[in-house]
């Protein structure tokens, strides 16, 4: 069997997206399981399940060196995924009869160090497991017991007081203390102090099983000393009641939250591991609600303790919805607000980009941080890494699912968008030459990018020099690939109208109208040119254009098109002021259709007090927003030839016949 090595092909770069460069396109023997899995990981380095499959294969063959190497790759990519560290530690615990400190302690040091700051309870429980195995109370006596108690207390301070679902830890700690058999009165006193301190800590925190713990505590105090029990219980009662109430609040806001990541290799399956580029939006919203709830500091903690609690929740969210950019963005900004060290934001954004390399949100946020610190090479590296990842995703999709036009077009749009931002960023930092260089690369991508790249570059050229010549040449280049794209032609016309290139507007219009197959976009092109001609040309030329328009679209409402021609500041005042029934978002109260005629007529009905309904005016009695939203989706009144609903008669019926008790 192959050892899984192969000559690595270069990944698709910003200048080449040939699908043949995909790592999974390498030719391998059918039996080369390891090689194939390594290729798949190289192509999709954020797919945790691929690493798990590879790990299980290495474990089955007892290839421990390869197991460690694979775990190291996982940890480098997902350093804050505590459940992956737990998988590694549980594997070590299971395969060793005697614990090897030289193997386990470096792993614990890496994952629990201040640099990473993993504060997940399941990971710290692995730490407790190791400490207890290493320090046997029977053989180690008082020294071993003190070490274990210190370890438990570290876990209390690091994460147990922040975790609402931590009953397993508290039970384990209590069980350890309760089974301590003191050999003298001093040790008995010590034991009582430790247990009381533990109860006073846990019963003040909003967490599960508080009621049962409270009963257990009150009974324990009675057993220790009936004379002092009431005093100790009374001192804790108010805090316990508050914690119980807060826990109920927490349960309500986190209803439906899923926290079931596997912590051993055998538990890990494709269904219970996060999938790259996927996350449950509903789960994300619950996490955001939990974070918002914690930000209110309902426990009235000190600033440092509140920050530690917020950090705990953020890092929990970063594990369970690790492919949601919003979590990383929010966590980075929160840490930036709470720390004087500006590099903290950069650190968390980099961790986020490792997890979601195709995220434009994280790439742009990180590049902003580098720009503020004038780190130009890092800016380019950050944005290009995002571009390369999108290139590879696009190449894979075009090869694996070439008929999925919607997904392909979405990736093309995203790729183009990131290039547009990249052009603007480098123009801002290094000037027009840098922007042109990027545009030159984009041109070589041909139809892998959308026409927006040409439009954006044209605007950049124009805004820098106010010279339309270069900008128009850029847009002409776009016609080579997008001459039949109605959306591109529309935006091209927008630019020409913006810079008042009258002759080019006419030229583009005449050369494009027979190439556009989308009738809606073609209609927009006609309307745009007619409106422009009405502003800068002659009435005869407008009439000529209108004639051609009506011949091509005989179904259009000529009055409506007439009013569109007389817009001012893009507002159709003719419809708003005189033909208001044509406007969907404003409807007068007293417009009705006469039953005996198809002609529209306004009727003014008299109220009982003789007051006529007034015509609606923008500055009088504004329509409530809810009504406006309803009116927006209703069809125009002119589509109804008879009165469907007699509002006045209905109001009279309600007034005269209905009595509200």
Swiss-Prot record:
Chain spans, region Disordered: 1-29
GO molecular function: mRNA binding
InterPro entries: HAT (IPR003107), Rna14-like (IPR045243), Suf (IPR008847), TPR-like_helical_dom_sf (IPR011990)
Pfam families according to UniProt: Suf
Bias (Low complexity): 12-24
Subcellular location: Nucleus; Cytoplasm
Entry annotated with the keyword Nucleus: yes
GO BP terms, alphabetized: mRNA 3'-end processing
Keywords for this protein: Cytoplasm, mRNA processing, Nucleus, Repeat
GO cellular component: cytoplasm; nucleus; protein-containing complex
Ranges of the HAT repeats in the UniProt entry: 62-94, 99-133, 143-179, 190-223, 264-296, 305-337
Cited function: Component of the cleavage factor IA (CFIA) complex, which is involved in the endonucleolytic cleavage during polyadenylation-dependent pre-mRNA 3'-end formation.
Protein name listed in UniProt: mRNA 3'-end-processing protein RNA14
Organism expressing this protein natively: Kluyveromyces lactis (strain ATCC 8585 / CBS 2359 / DSM 70799 / NBRC 1267 / NRRL Y-1140 / WM37) (Yeast)
Underlying gene: RNA14
């Amino acid at each position: 069997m192959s050892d899984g090595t192969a000559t690595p092909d270069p990944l698709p770069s910003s200048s080449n997206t040939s699908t043949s460069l995909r790592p999974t396109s390498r030719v391998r023997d059918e039996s080369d399981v390891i090689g194939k899995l390594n290729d798949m990981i190289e192509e999709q380095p954020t797919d945790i399940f691929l690493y798990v499959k590879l790990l299980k294969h290495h474990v089955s063959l007892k290839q421990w060196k390869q197991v460690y190497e694979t775990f190291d790759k996982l940890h480098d990519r997902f350093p804050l995924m505590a459940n992956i560290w737990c998988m590694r530690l549980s594997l070590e615990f299971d395969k060793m009869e005697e614990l090897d400190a030289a193997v386990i302690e470096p792993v614990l040091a890496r994952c629990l160090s201040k640099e990473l700051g993993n504060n997940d309870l399941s990971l710290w429980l692995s730490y407790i497991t190791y400490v207890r195995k290493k320090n046997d109370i029977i053989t180690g006596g008082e020294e071993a017991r003190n070490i274990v108690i210190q370890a438990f207390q570290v876990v209390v301070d690091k994460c147990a007081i922040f975790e609402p679902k931590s009953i397993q830890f508290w039970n384990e700690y209590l069980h350890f203390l309760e089974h301590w058999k003191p050999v003298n009165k001093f040790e008995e006193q010590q034991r009582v102090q430790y247990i009381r301190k533990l109860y006073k800590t846990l019963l003040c925190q909003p967490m599960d099983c508080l009621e049962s713990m409270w009963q257990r505590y009150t009974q324990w105090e009675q057993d220790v000393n009936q004379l002092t029990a009431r005093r100790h219980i009374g001192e804790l009662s108010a805090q316990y009641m508050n914690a119980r109430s807060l826990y109920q609040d927490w349960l309500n806001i986190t209803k439906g939250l899923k926290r079931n990541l596997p912590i051993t290799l055998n538990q890990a399956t494709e269904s219970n591991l996060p999938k790259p580029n996927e996350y449950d939006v509903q789960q994300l919203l619950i996490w955001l609600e939990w974070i918002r709830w914690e930000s209110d500091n309902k426990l009235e903690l000190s600033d440092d303790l509140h920050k530690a609690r917020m950090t705990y929740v953020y890092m929990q969210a970063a594990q369970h919805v690790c492919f949601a950019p919003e979590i990383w963005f929010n966590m980075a900004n929160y840490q930036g607000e709470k720390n004087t060290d500006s590099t903290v934001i950069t650190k968390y954004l980099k961790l986020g980009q490792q997890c979601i390399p195709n995220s434009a949100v994280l790439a742009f946020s990180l590049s902003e941080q580098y720009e503020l610190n004038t780190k130009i090479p890092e800016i380019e590296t950050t944005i290009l890494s995002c571009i390369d990842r999108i290139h590879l995703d696009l190449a894979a999709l075009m090869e694996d699912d070439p008929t999925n036009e919607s997904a392909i077009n979405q990736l093309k749009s995203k790729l183009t968008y990131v290039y547009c931002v990249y052009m603007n960023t480098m123009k801002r930092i290094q000037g027009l030459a840098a922007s042109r260089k990027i545009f030159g690369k984009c041109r070589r991508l041909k139809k892998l990018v959308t026409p927006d790249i040409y439009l954006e570059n044209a605007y950049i050229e124009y805004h820098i020099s106010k010279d339309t010549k270069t900008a128009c040449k850029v847009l002409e280049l776009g016609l080579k690939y997008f001459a039949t794209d109605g959306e591109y032609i529309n935006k091209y016309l927008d630019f020409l109208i913006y810079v008042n290139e009258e002759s080019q507007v006419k030229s583009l219009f005449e050369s494009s109208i027979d190439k556009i197959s989308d009738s809606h976009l073609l209609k927009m092109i006609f309307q745009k040119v007619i409106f422009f001609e009405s502003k800068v040309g002659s009435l005869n030329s407008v009439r000529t254009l209108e004639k051609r328009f009506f011949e091509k679209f005989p179904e259009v409402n000529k009055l409506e098109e007439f009013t569109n021609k007389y817009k001012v500041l893009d507002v159709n005042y003719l419809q708003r002021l005189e033909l208001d029934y044509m406007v969907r978002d404003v409807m007068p109260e007293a417009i009705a259709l006469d039953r005996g005629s198809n002609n529209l007529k306004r009727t003014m009905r008299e109220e009982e007090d003789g007051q006529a309904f007034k015509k609606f005016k923008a500055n009088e009695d504004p329509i409530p927003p809810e009504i406006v939203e309803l009116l927006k989706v209703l069809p125009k009144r002119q589509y109804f030839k008879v009165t469907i609903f007699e509002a006045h008669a209905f109001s009279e019926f309600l007034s005269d016949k209905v009595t509200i008790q």
